[in-house]
Amino acid sequence: MLILTRRVGETLMIGDEVTVTVLGVKGNQVRIGVNAPKEVSVHREEIYMRIQAEKGTPAASQGNF
């Protein structure tokens, strides 16, 4: 796992087309913004796991991505 430190307003790049920007920090919550092409799905982990469970994907039951 790559671990990075970013301040509010700073961005990181994932590949050439995905950016993740720190929008704010309040207590233990961090607001981030993600810009990605339409064909790239972006979900919170709990939503992704629910989608995988509905599909019957084995990774969902094991917690593997």
UniProtKB/Swiss-Prot annotation:
Function, as annotated: A key translational regulator that binds mRNA to regulate translation initiation and/or mRNA stability. Mediates global changes in gene expression, shifting from rapid growth to stress survival by linking envelope stress, the stringent response and the catabolite repression systems. Usually binds in the 5'-UTR; binding at or near the Shine-Dalgarno sequence prevents ribosome-binding, repressing translation, binding elsewhere in the 5'-UTR can activate translation and/or stabilize the mRNA. Its function is antagonized by small RNA(s).
One function term, GO molecular function aspect: mRNA 5'-UTR binding
InterPro entries: CsrA, CsrA_sf
GO CC annotations on file: cytosol
Coiled coil: none
Oligomer and partners: Homodimer; the beta-strands of each monomer intercalate to form a hydrophobic core, while the alpha-helices form wings that extend away from the core.
Pfam families with a match to the protein in the record: CsrA (PF02599)
Keyword field contains Cytoplasm: yes
Record-stated family: Belongs to the CsrA/RsmA family.
HAMAP family xref list: CsrA (MF_00167)
The protein, known as: Translational regulator CsrA
UniProt entry keywords in alphabetical sequence: Activator, Cytoplasm, Repressor, RNA-binding, Translation regulation
Location of this chain's protein in the cell: Cytoplasm
Gene3D superfamilies, A to Z: Translational regulator CsrA (2.60.40.4380)
Gene this chain is encoded by: csrA
GO biological process, one term: mRNA catabolic process
Species, as recorded: Aliivibrio fischeri (strain ATCC 700601 / ES114)
Source organism superkingdom: Bacteria
